[in-house]
Amino acid sequence: MTEHWHIKPFLFRQVFPNFEPLCDFDTIAEMASDEDIESRLIQHSKAGWTLEHGPFDALPSMKKKAWTVLIQGIDHHLPEAYDLLQLFRFIPDARLDDVMLSLASDGGGVGPHYDSYDVFLLQMHGKRRWKIGPLPNKELEEGMPLKILKNFEPTEEFVLEPGDMLYLPPNYGHDGVAEGTCSTLSIGFRAPTQAEVLSCILRDMADQIDQDPGMTQTLFSDPARGLQKNPAEIPDDLLNFGFNLIRQFSAKSPQIQRSMGILLTEPKTHVYFVNNTDDQEIHEIISVLGERGVALSMKTKMLFKDADFYINGDAVNPTSALTVKQLQMLANQREMEPIDAVEALKNPEFQYFLIGFAKAGWVETLM
């Protein structure tokens, strides 16, 4: 980690010996046809590059050269991909993003490009030739539907076979081309931008002012206002009204932490949960969860900091040390064996939270 993470590439040969594909062509085609799953079709010819967004009624024939379909977030839909992602939890969950699948015909790829985040490229089926290199120049081709590097000069080249994996740090150039039909898994890591963080913090601050009865909406006022010499000039006291508001929240780290927790667990656009509002059915589900164990949904993102918890964009604040311990177990293990679930459900506060999670569709039975 200290030598390569965020610093330089590393090639793992046969990190997964005898690696078996997580799914077949029919499953990939089915995911590409699902409107709730993000997919893209990229094709390359003498005329240039084309990009189409799914869902797709059908994929091109594998006999046709130089096309690639990308399926985002397959760990939300395939238990095998979900289990694979768990192997990468040596990095904090807050940084884990998802598993993307790339199926390509001979010659297929997405062109020379770079990612702004760390990525592991795991070969699932067939062979892919990777050309990689540092980027002294990030200039992109103009008029392209994809972000393709204009002057990419690779310094290394590898052919990956099933079970091989290539790690690339952020902003490192790479170009992968299929040699025959192949499929590759990309395990990506989230890197929120400053704009995302600031936007979420400010939005959450505004929500807190609206919802917290202890925080009253204060309008700007200027009872001592004198005559304005320059009518178009913004008054200093009005600017200070804004500055002081930001300072007020900046001094309250728990509120900043809350905003970050919400941002880091907020579901993506294509992630949906099925709500359950039938109280009788919910109590039956809770009973079953006690008997069969509890597991977070494959789509659920749950994080915590000390005694504060964040799940799928919501903040959860338990009051008892026991509940904190039980929720930390659920977040860290992403599941509870029946023996632990039965014991935890004896705690009314934990049961209260679990009922809320079950209603939102965020948990399911373990067995």
Describe the residue ranges of each PLM region.
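Active-site region of the double-stranded beta-helix
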Residues: 1-4, 16-164, 172-222, 364
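Long, charge-rich, low-complexity alpha-helical segments
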Residues: 7, 318-367
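Acidic, low-complexity/disordered tracts enriched in E/D and polar residues
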Residues: 251-330, 355, 367
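Long, charge-rich alpha-helical interaction segments
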Residues: 203-265
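Short coil/turn segments at secondary-structure boundaries
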Residues: 43-44, 258-260, 342
